[in-house]
Curated annotation (Swiss-Prot):
Protein name from the UniProt record: Modulator of FtsH protease YccA
Organism: Escherichia coli (strain K12)
The keyword Cell membrane is assigned to this record: yes
Gene Ontology cellular component terms for the protein in this record: membrane; plasma membrane
PROSITE patterns to which the protein is assigned, alphabetical: BI1
Record topology, Cytoplasmic segments: 1-22, 65-73, 126-132, 179-195
Function statement: Negatively modulates the activity of the FtsH protease for membrane substrates. Overexpression or stabilizing YccA counteracts the FtsH-mediated degradation of SecY when the SecYEG preprotein translocator is jammed.
TM region positions: 23-43, 47-64, 74-94, 105-125, 133-153, 158-178, 196-216
Length: 219
């Protein structure tokens, strides 16, 4: 009897996990599309950058709001507000590359981001490997990157900036592996939180690839 109950529970848990994964990918596709629209509008209208302080307040404020409302219907609205804002602040960055004739760099960064996401997701979904061991390493990597970013505010070293971008790509790729594994193993049951986590990883990979490829093109 216990085996029957256990087997039934496992199947229910697996179906629930798959549902979270499907909902996550669906919402992720919608937020990416919305972010692309706001980024395009920001680029075409040549909207100015909101500045460092407003960017940080808007980004972390909306992220906090999204996580706070993740279990409510308003969480979806918060997720779109967050991703839309990041799309808006991406516009001035894209204009910098377009004005320098680096449209091909943007295309390569998009392609590279899609490839990284596909490979990381496919690996976890195929192997179903538990990636929870990455948690500590990812946190340590984030701390190192933050220290490097603060240091480079004063040092202004191009080599350090490139190194930070490269590490950001590695950390974000690891975060995709970690979050996808967390979803399929039932560690993350909220698709809104999962969506935001994957979106931020994709955003960081794209911006970091832009930085690296743009630097290489200038040389």
């Amino acid at each position: 009897m216990d085996r029957i109950v256990s087997s039934s529970h496992d199947r229910t848990s697996l179906l629930s996990t798959h549902k979270v994964l499907r909902n996550t990918y669906f919402l992720l596709s919608l937020t990416l599309a919305f972010s692309a629209i706001t980024a395009t509008a920001s680029t075409v209208l040549m909207l100015p950058s909101p500045g460092l302080i407003l960017t940080l307040v808007g980004m972390y404020g909306l992220m906090f709001l999204t996580y706070k409302t993740a279990n409510k219907p308003t969480g979806i609205i918060s997720a779109f507000a967050f991703t839309g804002f990041l799309g808006y602040i991406l516009g001035p960055i894209l204009n910098t590359y377009l004005s320098a004739g680096m449209g091909d760099v943007i295309a390569m960064a998009l392609g590279g981001t899609a490839l990284v996401f596909f490979c990381c997701s496919a690996y976890v979904l195929t192997t179903r490997k538990d990636m929870s061991f990455l948690g500590g390493m990812l946190m340590a990597g984030i701390v190192v990157v933050l220290i490097g970013m603060v240091a480079n505010i004063f040092l202004q070293l191009p080599a350090l900036h490139l190194a930070i971008s490269a590490v950001f790509i590695l950390i974000s790729s690891g975060a995709i592996l970690f979050e996808t594994s967390n979803i399929i193993h039932g560690g993350e049951t909220n698709y809104i939180r999962a969506t935001v986590s994957l979106y931020v990883s994709l955003y960081n990979i794209f911006v970091s690839l832009l930085s690296i490829l743009g630097f290489a093109s200038r040389d």
